[in-house]
Amino acid sequence: MEISLLNIIACPLCQGQLLLQEQELVCQIDALAYPVRTNIPVLLVSEARNILVK
């Protein structure tokens, strides 16, 4: 994924900043990680994984 995209895209849920961590885009506000598949970010809430430890 191109790093320059991070300046353009935002979390689809809260419109907050996303951080690239390995193969995921992480929203720290919502504690969601969106997958990046074949260099394409999948910014669907239904595809996101909750990163909170239970």
Curated annotation (Swiss-Prot):
InterPro entries: Trm112-like
Similarity comment: Belongs to the UPF0434 family.
Alphabetical list of HAMAP family matching this protein: UPF0434 (MF_01187)
Protein name per its UniProtKB record: UPF0434 protein BCI_0256
